[in-house]
Amino acid sequence: MVSADEGVAVPPKLPLSYRLCRRFYRFLTNIWFREINIVDDENLPNEGGILYITWHPSGLIDPMLMMSVLPGQLTTVAKHTLFRIPVLGRLLRASSVVPIERPSDSKDLGASRQRNADRLSSLSSLISNGASVLIFPEGVTHADAGVRTVRSGAARILLAAIRDAKENGRPLPKFVPIGLH
């Protein structure tokens, strides 16, 4: 967005629910962590969509931390069963979290795959239109020392976003890996 009187790009105002959730998450992460260091944040892309990927060692702390420190509005991907938990489900929706169905959590695999394909398509569209999306490509939280097997969703989302951006003359989306430790 560009201000008419100054010709300077002005970021859009974030939705109130998102701003309140971010403030709450920052409060929690400030209690949880003694210190948060961000390295090379000056290298974050300033145009085009972004797909952030990171491993998932600490359950709900990881997305809260990412939402606390990353700029702009972040759409995060989470397993759909979390949305069934009454208070948490409302908080996730207010935080711009998108549910994804894991095959192990679905009774109707065909319908689950179709819903996920639709969600992956909408996520790639968001990215190709300049939004930021966070995904945990292992698909599970764990405390292992190394990375588990990575699922294909992140790659499919990014490839579709790049294809869409090229077809529509928009800036190419970027891929930003994040290390948590």
Predicted segments with their positions:
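Short, compositionally biased low-complexity segments
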Residues: 1-3, 93-94
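Short, Lys/Arg-rich, polar N-terminal cytosolic tail immediately upstream
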Residues: 2-12
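Soluble catalytic domains of membrane acyltransferases
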Residues: 11-181
